[in-house]
């Protein structure tokens, strides 16, 4: 036992010497490993003889031939780390480019974007042969058609099935209705209105006469009464329970009215605009009320009829050209902004021209006060402010009287009678303004 204790103490001393050494890399020799082997055998032999209280403490042994390295600690940089995406190098942002020193790539010139012109080889075999696949399918069918007409057909992208051959039929015969359908007549029911009681006497009188077609004298009201009852009339025009029915009734009457009744509708709208202008009404609400909703329809149908008699009524070339241009812009181009911009640059000095201006004014005035970026609102505000009751109808009467002083043509008389046609319906007309 004494000999085993001496061996254990000597092995322990050598182990402590190895652990206390300052060398970073420790290499355990074979001799030490043999001693440790004998030590382990001696410890195993005495485990049965020794009591648990007298057992030696286990000694932590490092495995043989293991190298231990100490990694030096890296010093951190005091400057902040900046991360730059490679996308910024290819497509640098203007702000980041100035901050990080990137140079912005110059934009390619227009010349560099253009593809290089195709230069065909002199060899005829190198030229692409025209095949039916790369040709326009309509080219062959339109080769004998007028180039202007062929260009319009191509722009409209009319399909090949709609192109007619020289000996073809003008339309598809299966579109023709049957004899039964041709003998039917559709019954158009009038607009149904709900019962609406009006306390104001003027409003009740206007609505009662507007439901029927009668003479303009029956619907005439003094401007004084209209001004005194303006707020009640405005409540009816904006908040009536039959608002949609009234609007449709007036549109139907305007579409089928003669020129005299169209002038009466224009006088009604001009007077209503002037009353709203004097009482600081809301133009957005006016644009959607019963009276002024039909301003575009009135302007369109009135100028359609003006175009029919300007050749005989207007002898001056510039007057005829101006009125014809305004009618064409409104009726065929739908450009109220272009027509209104043209009008504000002019001073009208002939009656038919002023009448056309009054047809345009309700439409252009509401357009300029509800659509931003319009610079002709002040011009048409002056037109509304300077309007006198019944001026549009008075201009028509004066123009016809002046014309018949010089014109004795029967054809002109028949044309004016057909256009004026005072016997047409004027349903929906609420009032005709009379001077005070």
UniProtKB/Swiss-Prot annotation:
Q: Is this entry keyworded Phosphoprotein?
A: yes
Q: Where is the composition biased (Low complexity)?
A: 104-119
- Give the Polar residues compositional bias ranges: 127-138
Alphabetically ordered keywords of this record: Early protein, Host cytoplasm, Host nucleus, Phosphoprotein, Transcription, Transcription regulation
User: Looking at the record's lineage, which domain of life comes first?
Assistant: Viruses
Q: Where in the cell is it found?
A: Host nucleus; Host cytoplasm
- Which residues lie within the region annotated Disordered? 71-140
Q: Its biological function?
A: Acts at a post-transcriptional level to regulate viral gene expression.
Belongs to which family?
Answer: Belongs to the herpesviridae UL69 family.
From the Swiss-Prot or TrEMBL record, give the protein name.
Answer: Immediate-early phosphoprotein 57
What species is given as this protein's source? Alcelaphine herpesvirus 1 (strain C500)
What gene name is listed for this protein? 57
